[in-house]
């Protein structure tokens, strides 16, 4: 999120070796990331391994003002037994506002979660292709849309409210999911790190930065050292 406020391509330029992790732009993004914690925007403990489950529980209990999640959160509505907060669906998503003057609001970020293919030794490639076609743009795709978990690459397939659980917040949840899909289709900033070594180094650097183990310069250098060692 913080890098996308500076440039849509900054993160990929760094992981592709086109720009140094120690560049002024990346250090600015890291400084702003730390600022979110220093200023209390991010709650203490939000980098822990339980932050996801704990955060959603607190949010639904009305004990947290907001949580950092993705468009797939709308799937919570489709459960059989949900809390009143989910059933009413009286909240919405937003993008992180610019942390400092001269920057842009955060962009939609993400990547491909699932991809399908047919192996060379597939015993029945025709049947496999039929299944993939359904998952991508047929009845299977419609079921995926109805679950409101993943956005489809194939356009114009939206949840069918006529077959979904009808609660007070149904239309609000579906509208939110559809709107986030349009945001993604309009342009997505990559969130994936292609090299596992770099992913680990980034995690270590950000943990150290927020925890006080690293300065911004040291955090940036930690990632750069991992990149240089490849």
Regions found by a protein language model. Give the residues of each.
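Extracytoplasmic/periplasmic solute-binding protein
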Residues: 1-22
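Extracytoplasmic/periplasmic substrate-recognition and gating elements
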Residues: 39-42, 82-149
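Short helix-initiation/N-cap motifs at beta->coil->alpha
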Residues: 45-60
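A ligand-binding cleft/hinge motif common to bilobed small-molecule-binding domains
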Residues: 71-86
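Alpha-to-beta junction loops
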Residues: 61-70
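Glycine-centered hinge/linker elements that transmit conformational signals in sensory
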Residues: 16-47, 96
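C-terminal capping/gating helix-and-loop segments adjacent to ligand/active sites or protein-protein/ligand interfaces
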Residues: 155-158, 171-227
């Amino acid at each position: 999120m913080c890098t996308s406020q500076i440039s849509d391509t900054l993160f990929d330029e760094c992981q592709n070796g086109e720009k140094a992790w120690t560049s002024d732009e990346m250090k600015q993004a890291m400084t702003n990331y730390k600022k979110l914690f220093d200023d209390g925007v991010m709650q203490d403990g939000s980098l822990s391994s339980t932050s996801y489950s704990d955060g959603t529980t607190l949010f639904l209990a009305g004990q947290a003002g907001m949580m950092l999640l993705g468009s797939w959160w709308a799937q919570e509505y489709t459960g059989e037994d949900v809390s009143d907060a989910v059933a009413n669906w009286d909240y919405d998503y937003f993008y992180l506002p610019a942390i400092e003057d001269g920057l842009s609001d955060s962009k939609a970020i993400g990547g491909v979660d699932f991809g399908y293919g047919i192996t060379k030794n597939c015993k029945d490639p025709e049947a496999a292709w039929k299944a993939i076609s359904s998952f991508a743009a047929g009845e299977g795709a419609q079921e995926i849309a109805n679950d409101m978990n993943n956005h489809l690459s194939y356009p114009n397939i939206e949840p069918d409210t006529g077959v979904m659980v009808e609660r007070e917040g149904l239309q609000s949840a579906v509208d939110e999911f559809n709107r986030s899909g349009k945001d993604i289709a309009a342009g997505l900033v990559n969130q994936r790190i292609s090299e596992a070594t770099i992913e680990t180094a980034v995690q270590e650097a950000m943990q150290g930065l927020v925890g006080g183990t690293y300065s911004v310069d040291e955090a940036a250098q930690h990632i750069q050292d991992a990149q240089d060692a490849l």
